[in-house]
Amino acid sequence: MHSDELLVEILVEELPAQALLNEYKEMPKKLHALFQKRALEVGTIEVFYTPRRLCLLIKDFPLLTQETKEEFFGPPVKIACNHQDKMQGLNALGLGFYQKLGLKDHQHFQTAFKNNKEVLYHAKIHAKEPTKDLIMPIVLEFLEGLNFGKSMRWGNVEKSFIRPIHNICVLFNGENFNNIEVKEYGFKTKQATKTHRQEGFDFIQVDSPKAYFEVLEKNHVILDPKKRKAKILQEIKELETKHHIIVEIDRDLLDEVVAITEYPSVLLGEFDKAFLKLPSEIITTSMKENQRYFAVFSQKSQEESPTLHNGFIVVSNAISKDKQKIIAGNQKVLKARLSDAVFFYENDLKKPLDNAPLESVVFVQGLGTLKDKMERESTIAQYLTQKYAPSLNMPLEKALELIGRAVKIAKADLLSEVVYEFSELQGIMGYYYALKQNENELVALSLKEQYLPASENAPLPSSVFSAIVALSLKLDSLFSLFSVGKIPSGSKDPFALRRLSFGLLKIIAHYGLEFDLKADLKNLFEKVGIYQSFDLEILEKFLLERFNNLIDCNPSIIRSVLNTNERDIVKIIQKVKALKRFLDDPKNAQKKELLFSAFKRLANINKDRNPNESSGFSISLFKELQEHALFEAFNAIKTSAFESLDSKIEAYFGLHAPLEEYFKSVLVMDKDIEIQKNRKNFLWGVYQSFLEIGDIKEIAI
């Protein structure tokens, strides 16, 4: 037998769920890297976890290391030997090389060739060694390499970790790993484990991976998080069927309850129906954030949408036959939480949105208060309302009044007691408060939707009205934060401006709104007039970089369109998609190289051209038939009115044949300078015309 199964358990105090989940996916990769570092070839690597243990299971862990050769290259023989003759023996330089390696016998030294020079050489062979001596150093290096964000020290230990470590149990090939002092973390190892807390506090001896798994299974520890998740989902499904309810499975919450339980049990509790007078988001958020409960819904018929039910799902880690006692305890805690929520909500309803003291809250240092931000957004909203008035289906005067009102009260809920308790309800609470205070429904809904989209695939504002309110918020945040240097760099983006920018582009694209990233940004910056001066091209470039996330496409096609003067967001997307359709068309697939060869040559001829240079040309200076043929084909395109971008692109790429003939027969760099200049100007005109769609030299096929 050359290998065996290796199991390592790190027993810890309860790990914080979110930190554990964030780092868990990296653990197998980090472990694999440590094995590679030591040239250990292993089988599959699995990492399991519960709140109080990490378990590393490695199949086919070798019993012995591989035999390795370590090579050392010294100085050139010419300068390391006496009289430049290696037969005369080594001089001080040569002797020094071997002495550094701890070698005394230099009589039969070796040489080798490196970089075409003969140099002193020595090879050290490392024989196979038992791998058992490497296991603990690997485990300790693994622990030190984990990144949980925060760590702590306890007692007089040398190293820190996210929570105190109580034991490292190593099970491998019957070897003895007991009583190894781990001074870094302040304990001696035991080949033992602990089970579920309710099963006992003592260590239980184990002597093999098989015995380890059996002990945990018999004592209410489900080691594999996938199995714990499956158990939770199965028990939820059974409760749904039994009680005719619908449980909303929040995936983040599901992962969290898997991470905080060793033996999960799913229980159904209920709360007083009187609490259902609260907005449903308050109840579901309170249950999730404070108690880690799943929300329950009921549905009277298939035609009706599910409504919040006065029930909740709790995932318990307790081992108890008295389930009702556990449920009763959770119901009592939830009642207190929801009673607090009622108090906050009713207090908020007493305060008019108009009276929110926005001037008392600083937006960002150097950018004024929330009131200042609201006033800047109002100016932006007025500009956008006038620009998009035809899409609002209401008189301009009415639109200006309602959107102005929406922006004025949009930030009021940030000062509410409910949002102070649950920040994720910002905007949502503004919607409910606005309805209760008899605001226009469009105004109220725009408050709810002002922060949308919340993520890449999340819903967008449901109307152009809401879109204008959302765009005003996003544009002001970009202008103001860029103006004080809060620009994302590398992985740092504390104000989530990349997500915000993506949302801005997605809203504009979804509603087909005209927005020029050069002209409109400049107009808005000047109209608001109070931002600190900064180079708007930096913001323009930042927004252009987001197109790679916005469009699922070959990046070079996106780059080709962005390399033109086109800065209208919708037109950029239309051109990219049209080029993609053309290049994806099966009829063009086989001739892409042919299509692009002439256009690439056209681009190369013009690559150093000054765009401001005069580009006039005269047909009278054309000498070759191919010049006239290309001009006629090009002129036919220039004077045509195309039904679509697709037909225009088709026509432009149709120039490849006359272009090929042109380059075969016409010498652009003619000896006659006037003819040469005329030809270059003509080709520049053809190239410039294609820039109406994209920069062909950027497209990679």
From Swiss-Prot:
Q: InterPro entries recorded for this chain? A: Gly-tRNA-synth_bsu (IPR015944), Gly-tRNA-synth_heterodimer (IPR006194)
- Keywords for this protein: Aminoacyl-tRNA synthetase, ATP-binding, Cytoplasm, Ligase, Nucleotide-binding, Protein biosynthesis
One GO cellular component assignment for this chain's record is: cytosol
Q: What is its EC number?
A: 6.1.1.14
Disulfide bridge positions per record = none
Catalysed reactions, semicolon-separated: tRNA(Gly) + glycine + ATP = glycyl-tRNA(Gly) + AMP + diphosphate
Provide a GO biological process annotation: glycyl-tRNA aminoacylation
Specify the domain of life of the species encoding this protein.
Bacteria
What Gene Ontology terms describe what this protein does at the molecular function level?
A: ATP binding; glycine-tRNA ligase activity
Q: Where in the cell is it found?
A: Cytoplasm
Q: Does the keyword Aminoacyl-tRNA synthetase apply?
A: yes
Say which family it is in: Belongs to the class-II aminoacyl-tRNA synthetase family.
Q: How does it assemble?
A: Tetramer of two alpha and two beta subunits.
- Official protein name in the record: Glycine--tRNA ligase beta subunit
Question: What organism is the protein native to?
Answer: Helicobacter pylori (strain P12)
